[in-house]
């Protein structure tokens, strides 16, 4: 899968736990890649993808969000989208 974020194409890659070295997800800014651990549940992978995307947005727009802010906003946005399926049609 590929995501276009702030004009850049990011490749989403699912990696082994060895490659992830204890991380669930990684935003690789210099490579335009998002790595997600392939050993996690689909729900955890989805959360990780949103989380890493928010890190990229924070960096691109100089928002300077800390880890806690990224975490809370990740869950808030997922809830918004899942609780309002018609939102994507607007």
Task: Describe the function of each predicted region.
Residues 47-59:
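Active-site recognition of the HExxH zinc-binding catalytic motif
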Residues 1-44, 60-90:
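Metalloprotease/metallohydrolase-associated module, dominated by Zn2+-dependent proteases
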């Amino acid at each position: 899968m590929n995501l276009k974020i702030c004009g850049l194409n990011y490749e989403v890659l699912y990696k082994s736990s060895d490659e992830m070295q204890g991380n669930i997800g990684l935003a690789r800014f210099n490579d335009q890649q998002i790595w997600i651990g392939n050993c996690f549940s689909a729900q955890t992978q989805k959360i990780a993808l949103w989380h890493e995307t928010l890190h990229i947005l924070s960096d691109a727009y100089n928002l300077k969000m800390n880890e806690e802010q990224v975490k809370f906003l990740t869950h808030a946005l997922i809830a918004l989208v899942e609780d309002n399926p018609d939102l994507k049609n607007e």
